[in-house]
């Protein structure tokens, strides 16, 4: 089982696992193959720019549609926020927490291994381990990177301003 937000590695991990006969299911957010993302990606004016252009490019070649389990919750939240019909979009960390909770709540459908990105949170990893599912975590940047950057900023003042948003750094710590 693979769980990831967006087209990380251009969907290479689920594609390779499927090719090798090892992909049980692929859990992701909105994309151009299923759900709300599929319909929005068909609208010519929306496909032309920004986030909708990125959404229209999220096509999972080599992964059968029957194995793709998606959620439109992240996209819906952003759209409602942009229309002032819900809380505004603040940052990607909220997406990570929401996706993490959704995957943890879904369960693991008999999977023996969960491959997930480090940044998506710990609820799904803890739930998988509690269910006896082996976890493989893709760490594409050290979880403490922001601390290292802040230390470098303090060491070499004047080159780049320090992060004034301590709450954001605390959120980074919380999710890692």
Language-model segment annotations:
Residues 1-44:
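N-terminal low-complexity, Ser/Thr- and acidic-residue-enriched intrinsically disordered segments
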Residues 1-2, 113-115:
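Short catalytic-loop micro-motif centered on adjacent basic/acidic residues
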Residues 40-42, 70-91, 131-172:
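Acceptor-binding helix/loop patch of EC 2.4 sugar-transfer enzymes
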Residues 117-120:
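Short His-centered aromatic/hydrophobic patch
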